[in-house]
Design a protein with these regions (language model features):
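Juxtamembrane low-complexity tails/linkers enriched in Ser/Thr-Pro and polybasic
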Residues: 1-5
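Active-site-adjacent structural segments surrounding the nucleophilic cysteine of cysteine proteases
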Residues: 7-15, 21-187
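Active-site signature of cysteine proteases
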Residues: 26-34, 43, 47, 238-289
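Extracytoplasmic/periplasmic, Sec-exported soluble proteins
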Residues: 153-162, 176, 194-198, 215, ...
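Extracytoplasmic/secreted envelope proteins and their assembly/folding machinery
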Residues: 163-170, 181, 185, 199, ...
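Predominantly the structural core of cysteine protease catalytic domains
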Residues: 193-257, 285-288
């Protein structure tokens, strides 16, 4: 009787095909997540990030301690955030600005991952970045619709807190949410400096849209009174909201606390803040009406 010898490595091609198919499926899944991150709706897209962020506390000051930042990112990675895992794996090769951003706020991890991997082509659609149910529309500077648009020597996602804050205010005053950060950033280009954005931009942009701007003294009751007249643009120093300098909007005063639209953080925008918590970080306040 003729005996058929089993061919050596007969199952190897099948295993290779299975491995290849798994790789392709994971790749397509990643690309789908990236492309659809903001395309279904602002809420559905951004709400995904709230599955993560378990190791971050919005009440903590921002830090430049890389040991703490890496530990924060590891917690994110361990919770199942693949983009955080990638940042941890490439931690030592990333610019400090990227590490400070992603390590201090999990909301920004997807932006950092996309930026570093050249995933910057996203569909534009109208509407706020997140619906927070307040007087001032909410825009994020790192919203994929405009985050990668050039501003100064980087982009809106990095340096666009000023024009994003101004876009929120103008959208509210005009009742027109089509006034988005990408539009206002074009006006801001010539005001960008090494330290951020010139404060002259806010007065000039307010006048460009037909509004007046006035400086408000740092006093709790002055802030409350001013908010009855319109939204406030606030420049802050290092603390809860930034390491170095930042621009954001105070939307209103409710139940003894200030409601803030932070263009760089959803979590810090969802928390209300007492005067004592933020007053020592405020550098300048403007009322636009």
């Amino acid at each position: 009787m003729k005996v058929h010898k089993r061919k050596k490595f007969g199952c190897l091609p099948t295993l290779l095909i299975i491995v290849f198919l798994i790789f392709i499926l994971n790749f397509l899944k990643t690309r789908y997540n990236e492309v659809s991150y903001y395309t279904d709706s602002p809420i559905d897209g951004i709400s995904e990030i709230f599955n993560f962020g378990l190791g971050f506390d919005p009440d903590e000051y921002k830090t430049d301690d890389k040991r703490i930042l890496k530990n924060n990112l590891k917690k994110e990675a361990n919770s199942g955030n693949d983009k955080a895992s990638w940042i941890v794996d490439n931690f030592d090769n990333l610019d400090d600005a990227l590490i400070y951003l992603a390590g201090n706020d999990p909301d920004t991890i997807a932006f950092v991952y996309n930026y570093q991997n050249g995933i910057t082509n996203f569909e534009f659609f109208p509407g706020e970045s997140v619906l927070l149910d307040r007087k001032t529309p909410y825009f994020l500077q790192w919203d994929n619709r405009w985050a990668y648009n050039a501003l100064d020597d980087k982009n809106i996602g990095f340096y666009g807190c000023g024009p994003t804050a101004m876009a929120m205010v103008l959208a509210r005053l005009n009742g027109d949410i089509s006034i988005t950060p990408d539009i206002v950033s074009k006006d801001a280009e010539s005001y960008m400096t090494y330290g951020g954005i010139s404060w002259d931009f806010f007065s000039d942009e307010a006048k460009r849209y037909g509004y007046t701007i006035s400086e408000i003294p740092l006093d709790e009751y002055e802030l409350i009174y001013a908010l009855d007249q319109g939204p406030l643009i606030v420049s802050v120093n290092g603390g809860y909201f930034t390491l170095f300098g930042h621009i954001m909007v105070i939307d209103s005063y409710k139940d003894g606390k200030f409601v803030i639209n932070d263009p760089n953080s959803i979590r810090k925008s969802q928390k209300s803040w007492s005067y004592d918590e933020i007053s020592n970080q405020i550098a300048k306040i403007w009322l636009i009406k």
